[in-house]
From Swiss-Prot:
Function description: Neurotoxin that induces paralysis (but not death) to U.thayeri crabs. Partially and reversibly inhibits glutamate-evoked peak currents (IC(50)=4.7 uM) but not voltage-gated potassium channel currents in cultured isolated neurons from the land snail H.aspersa. Weakly inhibits voltage-gated potassium peak currents (IC(50)=6.4 uM) and steady-state currents (IC(50)=8.2 uM) in rat dorsal root ganglion (DRG) neurons. Weakly inhibits voltage-gated sodium currents in rat DRG neurons (IC(50)=0.9 uM).
Name of this chain's protein: Toxin PhcrTx2
Tagged with keyword Ribonucleoprotein: no
Any single Gene Ontology cellular-component annotation: extracellular region
Remarks, miscellaneous: Negative results: has no inhibitory effect on voltage-gated ion channels Kv1.1/KCNA1, Kv1.2/KCNA2, Kv1.3/KCNA3, Kv1.4/KCNA4, Kv1.6/KCNA6, Kv2.1/KCNB1, Kv3.1/KCNC1, Kv4.2/KCND2, Kv10.1/KCNH1/EAG1, Shaker IR (with the inactivation domain removed), Nav1.4/SCN4A, Nav1.5/SCN5A, Nav1.6/SCN8A or D.melanogaster Nav1/para.
Subcellular location(s) per record: Secreted; Nematocyst
One term of GO molecular function: potassium channel regulator activity
Keywords associated with the record: Disulfide bond, Ion channel impairing toxin, Nematocyst, Neurotoxin, Potassium channel impairing toxin, Secreted, Toxin, Voltage-gated potassium channel impairing toxin, Voltage-gated sodium channel impairing toxin
Lineage: Eukaryota, Metazoa, Cnidaria, Anthozoa, Hexacorallia
Pfam families: Defensin_4
Disulphide bridges, residue numbers: C4-C40, C6-C32, C22-C41
Family designation: Belongs to the sea anemone type 3 (BDS) potassium channel toxin family.
Location (main, coarse): secreted
Length: 46
């Protein structure tokens, strides 16, 4: 996934395109929506 950063955060997350939310299988517990069609998911998946 591409790196992204939500407003107010210092660390980077994973950007997913064309998802209504974050995929379930990566352990994400936070997110913010970026421009239409992309979402930034935290924490970054290793």
């Amino acid at each position: 996934a591409l790196p992204c950063r939500c407003e107010g955060k210092t660390e980077y997350g994973d950007k997913w395109i064309f998802h209504g939310g974050c995929p379930n299988d990566y352990g994400y517990n936070d997110r913010c929506f970026m421009k239409p069609g992309s979402v930034c998911c935290y924490p970054k998946y290793e």
